[in-house]
């Protein structure tokens, strides 16, 4: 008669089989179900999600195995809004506990895509008839910059946007502008008209005396070479000012 072969739990490892049977299955982390539910809520009604929930969703790709809600809330507490989170300096984003360089890179990628998307709505198009799109683009590109930027939109004879360039970047409250350089660049691009744009990091788009004086100098320099300055727009965090609309040029 063949001898029964011992198995673990039949003498050599008493109770081993029972232990295996009693070992509970590993449960999913608490955030796993939350992620699925949040994704479904986004599919059903994206506008119903709070800002921190949208950030949570965005962080899922960068943070695979952790709860992203505390990080999303920490980002908003630190920077103030989704727009300010996306435009915050990469090194400051990385300092948020749980974020690090991977999250910082992910957020800067989204910022770059958003800016390029807005830019595509105005490039090589007649901009004077699409003024809202121009303002939306400039707001996306400049409203939350921490330093002043002086941007020039160069137009051809049909008022189509042929180039968009940041000519100068200054401090928190000043950007040096050189009319001769602006006109020179317009001639190089064969532009017949330009729109001047700069931001106020303070958030208030009200033109200063220096803004008005500089604009008049630029208008005169451009006029001498048959280049039209259509407007000078100042971008704030929650609005803009048009020197043309204010009858300051």
Swiss-Prot record:
GO molecular function annotations of the record: metal ion binding; metallopeptidase activity
Annotated region described as Disordered, given as residue ranges: 1-34
Biased composition (Basic and acidic residues): 24-34
Gene3D superfamilies given in the database record: 5' to 3' exonuclease, C-terminal subdomain, Cytidine Deaminase, domain 2
Keyword Protease among UniProt keywords: yes
UniProt keyword Protease present: yes
GO biological process: proteolysis
Pfam family, one: RadC
SUPFAM superfamilies: JAB1/MPN domain, RuvA domain 2-like
Motif (JAMM motif): 198-211
Binding site for Zn(2+): 198, 200, 211
Keywords in alphabetical order: Hydrolase, Metal-binding, Metalloprotease, Protease, Zinc
Segments forming domain MPN: 127-249
InterPro entries: MPN, RadC_JAB, RuvA_2-like, UPF0758, UPF0758_CS
Superkingdom field: Bacteria
Assigned protein family: Belongs to the UPF0758 family.
Protein name according to UniProt: UPF0758 protein BMEA_A1330
The species this protein was found in: Brucella melitensis biotype 2 (strain ATCC 23457)
């Amino acid at each position: 008669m063949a001898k029964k072969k011992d198995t673990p739990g039949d003498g050599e490892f008493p109770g081993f089989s029972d232990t295996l049977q009693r070992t509970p299955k590993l449960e999913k982390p608490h955030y796993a179900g939350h992620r699925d539910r949040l994704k479904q809520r986004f599919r059903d009604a994206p506008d119903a999600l709070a800002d921190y929930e949208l950030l949570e969703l965005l962080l899922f790709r960068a943070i695979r195995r952790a709860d992203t809600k505390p990080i999303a809330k920490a980002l908003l507490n630190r920077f103030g809004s989704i727009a300010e989170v996306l435009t915050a300096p990469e090194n400051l984003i990385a300092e948020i506990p749980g974020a690090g360089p991977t999250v910082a890179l992910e957020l800067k990628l989204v910022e770059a895509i958003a800016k390029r998307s807005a830019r595509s709505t105005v490039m090589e198009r007649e901009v004077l008839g699409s003024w809202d799109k121009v303002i939306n683009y400039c707001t996306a590109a400049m409203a939350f910059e921490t330093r002043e930027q002086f941007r020039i939109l160069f137009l051809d004879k049909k008022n189509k946007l042929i180039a968009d360039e940041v000519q100068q970047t200054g401090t928190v409250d000043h950007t040096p502008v050189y009319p001769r350089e602006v006109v020179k660049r317009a001639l190089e691009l064969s532009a017949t008209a330009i729109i001047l744009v700069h931001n106020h990091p303070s958030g208030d788009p009200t033109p200063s005396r220096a803004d008005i004086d500089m604009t008049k100098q630029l208008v005169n320099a451009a006029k001498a070479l048959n280049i039209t300055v259509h407007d000078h727009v100042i971008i704030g965090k929650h609005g803009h000012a048009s020197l043309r609309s204010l009858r300051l040029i």
